[in-house]
Amino acid sequence: MIYKSIAERLRIRLNSADFTLNSLLPGEKKLAEEFAVSRMTIRKAIDLLVAWGLVVRRHGSGTYLVRKDVLHQTASLTGLVEVLKRQGKTVTSQVLIFEIMPAPPAIASQLRIQINEQIYFSRRVRFVEGKPLMLEDSYMPVKLFRNLSLQHLEGSKFEYIEQECGILIGGNYESLTPVLADRLLARQMKVAEHTPLLRITSLSYSESGEFLNYSVMFRNASEYQVEYHLRRLHPEKS
C-alpha cells in the first residue's frame, strides 16, 4: 500500500542527520504535495510512524520526532554498546545461558581450535531503552579469557577483551542474512512470529591473528539500521 511506502521513506529521512530528536515534521499539507497523494494517505503514513514509536502528535502543535532507530555505521569496527552510548541510548543485557562446554566441530573450525577444547557458550538478549534489539549466541575460547564472568557479559565484550584482558581487536568478519522469527525467537525477542529479523554471524580476531569470539546474532530489522561507507579501490598506475 502506498501509505506504507511513504512511511518507510519518511522513516529513512527521520533517521538521517537532517532531523534531530524533538524536530518538528513538515505538515500534512506539505507532505501531501511532496508525495502527490491525499492528506488522508499522509495521515495513515504518520499513524505508522506513531505506531513504530518514532514520532508523537501534539495537539495544536504538530508531529515531533521522539526516537531514532539504532544506526550502526560500518566505516570502522565498533561494539554495539559503544555505538549506543554515542547515540545517547541506554543498553542493558539479560544473560540467559552462561556455561563452559567442549567445542563442537563447527565452532572449533570457526575459532581455529581443537575439537572438544573448552569454550564459553553464552546466550544473551540486548535491550535498548527497555526494548529487545538483539539475541546473541556467543562462543569464546576459555584459554584466552580465564576470568570471563556473568558481569562481563552484562556489559561490553569489546571493553572486557581490550581493557581488562589487554588484547587489541584487529577486526571482524560478518555476514548478514534476512530471516523470519520462529516461535522461540519471537518469544525471546518479544515480537510476533514471522517478524523480519537480521541473522548476523560475526567472527572477531586480535591484532596478533588469534580468533577471539564467534557469535550468531538475531537483530530486530525494524529497530536496526546499518549505514555503509565503502571506498572504491583503483589499480595503481604504472
Swiss-Prot record:
InterPro entries: Bact_HTH_transcr_reg (IPR050679), Chorismate_lyase_/UTRA_dom_sf (IPR028978), Tscrpt_reg_HTH_GntR (IPR000524), UTRA (IPR011663), WH-like_DNA-bd_sf (IPR036388), WH_DNA-bd_sf (IPR036390). GO terms for biological process: negative regulation of DNA-templated transcription. It comes from the Bacteria. Residues 1-68 form the HTH gntR-type domain. SUPFAM superfamilies: Chorismate lyase-like (SSF64288), Winged helix' DNA-binding domain (SSF46785). Pfam families: GntR, UTRA. Keywords: DNA-binding, Transcription, Transcription regulation. One of its GO terms (molecular function) is DNA-binding transcription factor activity. Residues 28-47 bind DNA. This is Uncharacterized HTH-type transcriptional regulator YidP. It comes from Escherichia coli (strain K12).
